[in-house]
Amino acid sequence: LVNYGVTDNGIAVIELCSDSAGDPLTEGKTPVNTYTNAMMRDIDEAVLKARFDDDVTVIMLTGHGEKFFSAGASISMLDSVSPGFKYFFCLHANETLSRLEQTPKLVIAALNGHAVGGGLEIAMAADIRIGRKDSGQVGLPEVSLGVLAGTGGTARLSRLVGKAKAME
């Protein structure tokens, strides 16, 4: 669910790689890079691996394919688990993103496509977010549905752009 590698010049590349259900990609499936508990654990493990690698100076997060950085949490996974599991899933995801945010190495989110919902929350945990022109939508659509972003996205957004801009 996460491809991890280190380039010759010390960049740890963490590539999110899943279909719309959050399952591993198979032939013919579109990479939407939604995350499940398993992927979030893989992200957490990759972040820790990069942190402890003295040869790594930069961590770069990206999504597999050209259309999505990440479409956020897998709705099918969230629909199939208990409220208690959802609570601990969101808690672990928030802890993982906080760990990413507090990593003393430079963290770059390379937005290669849409970054919505939890996908944007992952990107906001990076030090720098970059994307190509017209690469896709960026937003927290759950807020317009009256749902609080599950991994601290509203708080991260207001810290990044200020409260007034975040309210827009």
Where are these regions (language model features)?
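An acidic, glycine-rich surface segment that forms the CoA-thioester-binding/catalytic face
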Residues: 40-44, 51-52, 75-112
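Crotonase-fold acyl-CoA enzyme core
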Residues: 101-168
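Conserved CoA-thioester-binding segment of acyl-CoA-metabolizing enzymes
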Residues: 1-62, 98
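Glycine- (often His-adjacent) and acidic-residue-rich active-site loop
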Residues: 18-23, 27-30, 63-96, 146
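Hydrophobic/aromatic residues within transmembrane alpha-helices
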Residues: 43, 61, 74, 122-124
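Short beta-strand/turn micro-motifs composed of small residues
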Residues: 62-63, 111
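Structured loop/turn residues at beta-strand edges in well-structured enzyme cores
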Residues: 9, 54-56, 73, 102, ...
